[in-house]
Amino acid sequence: MDKDLNTGYYKDFDTNFEQAYSLLEKNFSHEELLKLLKDGNIPEKQIATFMFDEVNTEEDAEALINNLTGCDGKIREAVALKIYQILSSSKECLKLFIYPKIFAQATIDINANICRLVVDSAKFLKANEEFAINYTDEIIKITKSALDELDKFIFRDKKYVINKQLFKLYWCLESLKNFYEFVDREELSTILEKCAQNSEYTIREKTAQLVRFVGSFPDIEEQLKKDENYYVRCVFD
């Protein structure tokens, strides 16, 4: 049976399933799970994440955070779910997850399920001012970069390249619903004005939701209330 040395996956589904099942049957200690999270292959890291129920130290939190970006999507999604479960159920753990740059990068993951879990997890860390300020700063940088890239695109550019920036912009706007207080008002106004003029209606719809949520940009609100798209206008109904 051929095995990919980088991922730990076998080429046939049944073998991968059997390996995962055999791991689930084992009783791992916390230290063993921690080691698998650090050094395991893809199936091992997935199973270790699902079984990792205690986060008591910075080392525990770091082992999860280090697998939130820059690794296989199966691991990233499992870790994003686990972090959400931990932060939503334990206030004591919040101080261990102050990694604003990593959270910001994970906010724009290519997997929308991960984006949603990370945005919802970040809300629990908002009370930590250091995290909130630095996370928001990173999100604003990504937002501005996406807007700049979209300004450069022309009709001949490939659709997937444009969609990549729109996807980033969408999730940045979603995250700003929770952190808009940490953005300079003029800067936020400029961003919202640009987004309100975007040709993609989902961006205008997300902008309308943010404008309505913040409630202090009447000119942009009036513009979006008259938008050509039904779903954008419906935000204010």
Q: What positions do the PLM features span?
A:
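Amphipathic alpha-helical scaffolding segments comprising HEAT/armadillo-like alpha-solenoid repeats
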Residues: 1-5, 24-36, 57-67, 89-106, ...
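Short, mixed-charge aromatic SLiMs
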Residues: 76, 106-109, 145-149, 198-199, ...
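Leucine-rich solenoid repeat scaffolds
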Residues: 221-237
